[in-house]
Curated annotation (Swiss-Prot):
Glycans are attached at residues 48, 120. Its main location: secreted. Keywords: Antiviral defense, Cytokine, Glycoprotein, Growth regulation, Pyrrolidone carboxylic acid, Secreted, Signal. This is Interferon gamma. GO terms for molecular function: cytokine activity; type II interferon receptor binding. Released primarily from activated T lymphocytes. The modification Pyrrolidone carboxylic acid is found at residue 24. Homodimer. Interacts with IFNGR1 (via extracellular domain); this interaction promotes IFNGR1 dimerization. The keyword ATP-binding does not apply. GO terms for cellular component: extracellular space. It comes from Macaca thibetana. One of its GO terms (biological process) is adaptive immune response. Disulfide bonds: none annotated.
Length: 165
């Protein structure tokens, strides 16, 4: 009886161990492929610290982290765009972009498309510059948390008056 339990436990360990190998996120395998392609496993890559990891560790609040993550995701999209025609890493790039879509954009295609549109604007294009400056005051107002709170208080105040009338 005891031996049967040990055998079943051993088989369970083997099954769970093998599932760990096969259930690994596809992006990990593809990221390893990109590491080989870019020689990112070489020791000199660690010189002068990390690009992104220290920055992410510095920010604990979710909203702050999202800001930093959006810049990092933007960087990766630009990096991948530079190598979109390289057939040797095409599958890896597409797999990782799809995983970013799921993790960062919650599979929301509209959110991803708008994000990519923002990252593709050229700051050297005079028409883009003119439009950006034209919209600057409204964008700054949207950035201000005080403006949002004031709007919310006014709308709650009006709702309260309507309910009491």
């Amino acid at each position: 009886m005891k031996y049967t339990s040990y055998i079943l436990a051993f088989q369970l360990c083997i099954v769970l161990g093998s599932l760990g190998c096969y259930c690994q996120d596809p992006y990990v395998r593809e990221a390893e492929n990109l590491k080989k392609y870019f020689n990112a496993g070489d020791p000199d890559v660690a010189d002068n610290g990390t690009l992104f990891l220290d920055i992410l560790r510095n920010w604990k609040e979710e909203s702050d982290r999202k800001i930093m993550q959006s810049q990092i995701v933007s960087f990766y999209f630009k990096l991948f765009k530079n190598f979109k025609d390289d057939q040797r890493i095409q599958k890896s790039v597409e797999t990782i972009k799809e995983d970013i879509n799921v993790k960062f954009f919650n599979s929301n295609k509209k959110k991803r498309d708008d994000f990519e549109k923002l990252t593709n604007y050229s700051v050297t294009d005079s028409n883009v510059q003119r439009k950006a400056v034209h919209e600057l005051i409204q964008v700054m107002a949207e950035l201000s948390p005080a403006a949002k709170i004031g709007k919310r208080k006014r709308s709650q105040m009006f709702r309260g008056r309507r309910a009491s009338q």
